[in-house]
């Protein structure tokens, strides 16, 4: 098997993944279909008769090296030359906001929190949700937020609506780098709003993964961001320091001048 494929155990998703040996392509999950294909290939080419369940048991052992793909990505980014600067500023210049005085300061703090959350298991390092608001639809708000996720990590980006009191959100917090809430914040009732505030800052989540026997605790990995059509979304008249709202006037699609690698490094 090692001659044909490279294997790793993804500690974020708690599953074994594979790719062709010596390939630089993305790893893919070992699904039931893949397991059956492995079994068929072993039987046909090597004369080894075994079960798909036996192969799965082997692959979910120290046969596959453990990897945290998100941390591996950040650890392989190049070290920046101190003389180089302004990568965040160039990205933020693609967005014209109504309150530009705080835009770079608070975005930078939030982005640092994203990386800190991903690199540390203890506690929640990012206590805020970046929110882009605006009266106009089709301003590319959600698109711009989605592009903050590196291409190699797109499997760790969730964009859509959430249930703050449901079980699925616990999986998203433990297994994703970004949760992009798409035009939902102004629809939340008071109960769901309070639940979301708690989720943003919770240090860990507890749930039982499919096919696991016990409920286990997992560190808070995800950082929250959101887009809203309109400028009013908080039902609490006193506001909330958990949300960092910026009213978008215009978004220009980033050009090649923006270095996303340097931005995240």
Residue ranges of predicted features:
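N-terminal nucleic-acid engagement/recognition segments and initiation subdomains in replication
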Residues: 1-86, 90, 101-105
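Conserved catalytic/switch belt of AAA+ P-loop NTPases
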Residues: 194-213
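AAA+/SF3 P-loop NTPase mechanochemical coupling elements
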Residues: 169-174, 209-227
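P-loop NTPase catalytic core of nucleic-acid-dependent motor ATPases
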Residues: 61-174, 178
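Conserved AAA+/SF3 P-loop NTPase catalytic/coupling segment centered on the Walker-B
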Residues: 178-200, 236-239
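A short beta-strand-to-loop transition that corresponds to the Sensor-1 phosphate-sensing loop
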Residues: 183, 221-231, 248-249
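A short helix-turn-beta junction within AAA+ P-loop NTPase domains corresponding to the substrate/partner-engaging
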Residues: 235-252
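Conserved small/polar residues in nucleotide/adenosyl-binding loops
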Residues: 261-265
């Amino acid at each position: 098997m090692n001659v044909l494929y490279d294997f790793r155990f993804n500690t974020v998703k708690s599953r074994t993944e594979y790719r062709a040996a010596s390939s630089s392509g993305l790893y893919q999950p070992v699904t039931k279909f893949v397991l059956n294909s492995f079994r068929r290939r072993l039987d046909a080419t090597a004369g080894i008769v075994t079960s798909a369940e036996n192969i799965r048991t082997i692959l979910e052992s120290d046969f596959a090296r453990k990897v945290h793909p998100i941390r591996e990505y950040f650890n392989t980014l190049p070290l920046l030359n101190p003389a180089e600067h302004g990568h965040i500023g160039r990205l933020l210049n693609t967005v014209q906001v109504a309150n530009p005085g705080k835009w770079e300061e608070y975005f930078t703090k939030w982005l640092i929190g994203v990386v800190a959350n991903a690199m540390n298991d203890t506690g929640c390092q990012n206590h805020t949700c970046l929110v882009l608001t605006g009266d106009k639809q089709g301003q590319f708000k959600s698109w711009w937020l989605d592009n903050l996720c590196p291409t190699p990590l797109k499997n760790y980006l969730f964009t859509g609506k959430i249930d703050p009191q449901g079980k699925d959100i616990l999986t998203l917090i433990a297994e994703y780098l970004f949760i992009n809430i798409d035009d939902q914040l102004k629809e939340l009732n008071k109960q769901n709003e309070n639940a979301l505030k708690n989720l943003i800052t919770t240090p860990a989540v507890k749930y039982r993964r499919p096919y696991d026997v016990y409920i286990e605790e997992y560190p808070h990995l995800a950082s929250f961001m959101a887009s809203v059509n309109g400028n009013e979304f908080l039902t609490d008249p006193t506001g909330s320091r958990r949300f960092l709202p910026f009213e978008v006037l215009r978004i220009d699609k980033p050009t090649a001048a923006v270095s996303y690698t340097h931005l995240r490094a």
